[in-house]
């Protein structure tokens, strides 16, 4: 009696609340994972130019509760990968703040190129001239209609001739390109500045990252350290 303020567990602006806080009877309060889901919604809103991943109007909170979303207004595959992780309906499956900051979406260009070089050093790229047909087919599907299709014709002819060699030319596919990047940075340092890989092939990093994630290459000891940031722990 005489209470002038009512404290509730659930708070927040309509359509900007995490799934677990929509059900006030659940007794679940706000946690870091709650903030992560809302941050994912906001990230999509900003990148997409004003769209909500769970829709709008009366259906928005229902979609949040049911985990129904769309990321159709964002083209960046790396951004979508992070947003999808952040807005997962299961709080336990969302990234931590540290995971979020370490995600490739926030990597500078130098780190992205270095990652491609590291992928080019993996056994699959090393054996690009005798690659498994199934792997090549899967990569071809990923590379279809991408900027790096027929990549050899887009590299400066003098540089391509220099690296190609007479006996072992690079195959004109994604594995061949990754091996080319690796060898360029390993053995032809003086020529590295003559080609801007990320500008020439803007969708290469996203395609390779998503493919490597799907194939669990990123979990290998040679690559997994790239997905941690000691400075934010």
Short names for language-model regions:
Residues 112-233:
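Regulatory extensions appended to serine/threonine kinase catalytic cores
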Residues 62-74:
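Short proline-rich PxxP-based motifs
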Residues 89-113:
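Terminal C-lobe "cap" of eukaryotic-type protein kinase domains
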